[in-house]
Every structure is written in C-alpha cells, then in structure tokens.
Amino acid sequence: VLSPADKTNVKAAWAKVGNHAADFGAEALERMFMSFPSTKTYFSHFDLGHNSTQVKGHGKKVADALTKAVGHLDTLPDALSDLSDLHAHKLRVDPVNFKLLSHCLLVTLAAHLPGDFTPSVHASLDKFLASVSTVLTSKYR
C-alpha cells in the first residue's frame, strides 16, 4: 500500500519524467529485451532493433498506462481494469515479465533523473510499480 509520502514521491517523480515518458518507456523495453531475452517472445512480430518504431510505440503505451496509474493512485484496480483483462486473457503475458519491466523502468529513471532518484523516491517508485504489477496480474486467477 502506498503511503501519503509514497504518493507524493511518485507524483513528483512522474512530473519530472514529463514529456520524456514515451522515450523512457521505449528505453525500458529495450533494456528488458537486452537483459531478459525471453521477454522477446511476446513481441516476435516486432522489429526489436534499437530505435524501432514498434518498440517506441509500445513504450508510449506503457508510459501512457503509467501516467494514468499515477493519476489514479487510490483507484488503481478500476483505472487499469481493461489492461489487466488484456494482459491476462488475450495476451497471456507471464506475470514475471511485469517485474522485469518494472526493474528496467527503475534503471531507466535512475539513469535519466539521477539527482531526483533518492533512496526514498526509489522505494516509492518500486512500491508503485509493484502495485501496478499486482493489478495487472490480478485477473490471472
């Protein structure tokens, strides 16, 4: 559960991401594909090369979903219900992949926002991404 301080940290950090969100989303996906090659399975129809327009497009989708989540921190299950259905029932993404992408997102944010990525912000973002992952995997049962 996100504390009031966590919510403040997440909102402030995401505000600093600003209009770089889509680029950071794409970079996190690239990091995930390089670091965890098994994740490429779900994107076999994509060009997974550096600066791929398909990866950039999906990075934007990831960023848009996270932006929506940041705006609905108190109602994540409702806000992300459609995405949860999509990933559980249609795409059937292995839940572990959300943790892998979350890790790559944290690395990307730390690389681009080093002065703002304090231990408390890191912890808050980690809790936030874990909460998003929990919601996205909630309909797998």
From Swiss-Prot:
The gene is HBA. The modification Phosphothreonine is found at residues 8, 108, 134, 137. Keywords: Acetylation, Heme, Iron, Metal-binding, Oxygen transport, Phosphoprotein, Transport. The modification N6-succinyllysine is found at residues 7, 11, 16, 40. GO terms for biological process: hydrogen peroxide catabolic process. The modification Phosphoserine is found at residues 3, 35, 102, 124, 131, 138. Involved in oxygen transport from the lung to the various peripheral tissues. O2 binds at residue 58. Belongs to the globin family. The modification N6-acetyllysine is found at residue 16. PANTHER family: HEMOGLOBIN FAMILY MEMBER, HEMOGLOBIN SUBUNIT ALPHA. The keyword Manganese does not apply. Heterotetramer of two alpha chains and two beta chains. Heme b binds at residue 87. GO terms for cellular component: blood microparticle; haptoglobin-hemoglobin complex; hemoglobin complex. This is Hemoglobin subunit alpha. Gene3D superfamilies: Globins. It comes from Physeter macrocephalus (Sperm whale).
